[in-house]
């Protein structure tokens, strides 16, 4: 049997660091934990643990994709008990809406370029 883990690692450019950390902490209510795994890295990696146990880490490097390039990377999904409220909150935060030409879903681009779909916890 093969399964997909619930651990994600992203790359983002250093100039997006403060705003991206603010997105995860202020907008999503997560704690940013500096990782001890980044031995020799000029920038610390940060990890975030979600309510369902999923984890996401971010590494800041100049080699990360641009925001435009990141739109062609993996798109992630955030599930919320108040999806509409979170959608409004991230738009007020200034995140860019991303429109997929073939789906009706709500997508935003986080600082750093990653695209997130925001859905209700009960959606499939």
Feature locations, PLM:
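A generic fold-level signal
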Residues: 3, 40, 70-71, 100
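Vicinal oxygen chelate
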Residues: 12-18, 71-115
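Conserved acetyl-CoA-binding loop of GNAT-fold acetyltransferases
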Residues: 25-33, 94-96
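Alpha-helical scaffold elements within enzyme catalytic domains, especially in hydrolases
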Residues: 23-26, 89
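Residues that flank catalytic or metal-binding motifs in active/ligand-binding sites
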Residues: 4, 44, 54, 72-74, ...
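A short alpha-helix capping/helix-coil boundary motif
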Residues: 1, 64-67, 88
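N-terminal beta-strand motif that seeds the catalytic metal site of vicinal oxygen chelate
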Residues: 1-21, 33, 73-76, 122-124
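Conserved short beta-strand elements that form part of the metal-binding/catalytic scaffold
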Residues: 31-70, 115-122
């Amino acid at each position: 049997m093969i399964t997909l883990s619930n651990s994600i690692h992203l790359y983002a450019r250093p100039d997006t660091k403060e705003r991206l950390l603010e997105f995860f902490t202020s907008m999503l209510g997560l704690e940013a934990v500096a990782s001890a795994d980044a031995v020799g890295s000029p920038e610390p990696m940060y990890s975030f643990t979600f309510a369902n146990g999923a984890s996401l880490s971010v590494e800041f490097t100049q080699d990360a994709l641009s925001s435009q390039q990141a739109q062609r990377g993996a798109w992630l999904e955030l599930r919320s008990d108040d999806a509409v409220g979170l959608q409004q909150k991230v738009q007020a935060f200034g995140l860019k809406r991303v429109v997929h030409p073939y789906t009706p879903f709500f997508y935003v681009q986080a600082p750093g370029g990653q695209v997130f779909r925001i859905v209700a916890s009960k959606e499939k």
